[in-house]
């Protein structure tokens, strides 16, 4: 991999007895990397997350979209809401990035959707507890931050943006509950007229605009510690 070519490759990460499938995109001379944590019933093929990822790539940010569950696991509804498992799988993806010499030095952000947002917040909080600020920023799209532990919400230091559709009223309330507990730099952005999947005209474009702006602002650190996450 060189700094002057666009890299797109499929990857597999071995975690315990599972293999996680992922898609890596690295633009020339990236300003940072963003790891996507998909929500329940979604995957690396999510058209919404891929749309956001493409906008990030256009702005010089590398992306890794990865399935946190295998196909068999995803059929089990209870596993979809196993936040601890999702967090451990997300940690394995971070470890993979930190061991990849071509991208390990770039600032790292997390983009979470639905239950994936809870896993992203818990992982970011882990870094704080481990005295390691390796997560530079977090963005949640229609996320369930309320499913993260209270300790994680109160501990996280990474600047966090919560994006919710204005018509997704129950999720707005859940985001507000989590937002109150968070002590980091934070912002709750409600997109008027948007529902949970942001399928309305212009809604996903607004999500992308907000995410690009947030990550460009905080993915500024030129190097980060190459430290594996202990389980």
Regions from the language model: what does each represent?
Residues 11-103, 199-202, 206:
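Serine-hydrolase catalytic machinery in alpha/beta-hydrolase-like enzymes
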Residues 102-114:
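Alpha/beta-hydrolase fold nucleophile elbow
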Residues 112-122:
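Glycine-rich nucleophile elbow surrounding the catalytic serine of serine-hydrolase chemistry
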Residues 131-145:
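A conserved short beta-strand
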Residues 156, 162-164:
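Short beta-strand/loop motif that positions the catalytic acidic residue
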Residues 169-174:
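Conserved alpha/beta-hydrolase "acid-adjacent" motif
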Residues 182-197:
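Catalytic histidine neighborhood in serine/cysteine hydrolases
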Residues 202-231:
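Catalytic active-site module of serine/aspartate enzymes centered on a nucleophile-bearing elbow/loop
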